[in-house]
Amino acid sequence: MGEQPGDQEDRAGTPFVGPAGRVLEEALAAAGVERAHVYLTNAVKHFKWEPRGKRRLHAKPRLSEIQACEPWLELELSRLRPRVVVCLGATAARAVLGRPVTVAGHRGRVLSTNLVPAVFVTAHPSAILRASDAASRARGRAQLVADLRQAAARAL
């Protein structure tokens, strides 16, 4: 579960079709997770953005925007009944868990809610893309793959 659509996702009407989606696809493959077995969605259903010239840049959603999308998120989870949800980023984790969390403080731990028996928190693929250097990006990718492997093992 991502945080919110990005520019390309907003235009396409499909989550994870932009650069972060490519990072996620590569990480899923490296973790041995078949894309066909994964349901991708976002916690916040609209793209909040700020204009920068001709570009639309991501802006962090407010708590009220996260809460406004709760009914859709709860409906998705109640219908899908996933065994595991991987929250990509702190905004997605807050939406699923109903409280503020940090990726660093919760990565690697199995959490739960009344709708999902196992919740994992990891970095959003866009954070990997924004890393300052190649070594940081490689470290971020390796952590994402490890987190996805852990979640996949729990789903079995």
PLM regions with names:
Residues 1-156:
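A polyanion-binding, active-site-adjacent surface
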